[in-house]
Amino acid sequence: MTHSPLAQFDIKKLIDIKMFGFDVSFTNSSIYMLLASILALTYFYLAFYNRKLVPSRLQVSAEIVYNLVADMLNQNIGVKGRKFIPLVFSLFIFILFCNLLGMTPYSFTATSHIIVTFTLAILVFLIVTIVGFVKHGLRFLTLFLPHGTPLWLAPLIIVIELFTYLARPVSLSLRLAANMMAGHVLLKVIAGFTVSLMIYLKFLPIPIMVILIGFEIFVAILQAYIFTILSCMYLNDAINLH
């Protein structure tokens, strides 16, 4: 029987847990998010626990990732953004490892579920809002009224800017979840046809499949980068009011 391409996204309970009337069961999504966190911690521990003047390849790769995030913050926020390196770096690494872990056979892609990506997006949204009010007080509300806006146009602009601001976590989460789900569905569908196509095209479908997998790995890395760079831009709006 041919399985549905969407079956790979099914949430399955591993340990049934009820707490205060809420279902907080440990699922396959939970275990893969936990596994992604453990793999990330292990990777950076092995890369930095014995740092050398002449770095190993593992240390070089870890430093490249760190510098990538540091540059994102520096280019978008400036020196003031350095204090947010732990937050943004953790966000990028968690999403990256969840995305890449989902590329392994018979695994689960936690970031293909909107509840996971929306939680991350809401976290960014709340931090940005709190930082904005803590740093600027009520002046943060001027974010919704660009400087130089005509008075008669102000009510409309405020509504549009407020709606755009509130829509940030929705667009941020949907973009990541939709791209990860679409890519995996495409791979599943094409993989299902590969065996049949090999009867007529011999081994031609195999390199095509390899290319598609390589492209999906690129998308997994790119989506982690896009989520993070947008988070940096939102932080910049809160720190450096325009």
UniProtKB/Swiss-Prot annotation:
PANTHER family documented for this protein: ATP SYNTHASE SUBUNIT A (PTHR11410:SF0)
Name of protein: ATP synthase subunit a
Native source organism of the sequence: Rickettsia peacockii (strain Rustic)
Family matches, as Gene3D superfamilies: ATP synthase, F0 complex, subunit A (1.20.120.220)
SUPFAM superfamilies documented for this protein: F1F0 ATP synthase subunit A
Keywords from the named record: ATP synthesis, Cell inner membrane, Cell membrane, CF(0), Hydrogen ion transport, Ion transport, Membrane, Transmembrane, Transmembrane helix, Transport
Family, similarity comment: Belongs to the ATPase A chain family.
Gene Ontology MF, one: proton-transporting ATP synthase activity, rotational mechanism
A single cellular component GO annotation: plasma membrane
Cellular compartments annotated: Cell inner membrane
InterPro entries: ATP_synth_F0_asu (IPR000568), ATP_synth_F0_asu_AS (IPR023011), ATP_synth_F0_asu_bact/mt (IPR045083), F0_ATP_A_sf (IPR035908)
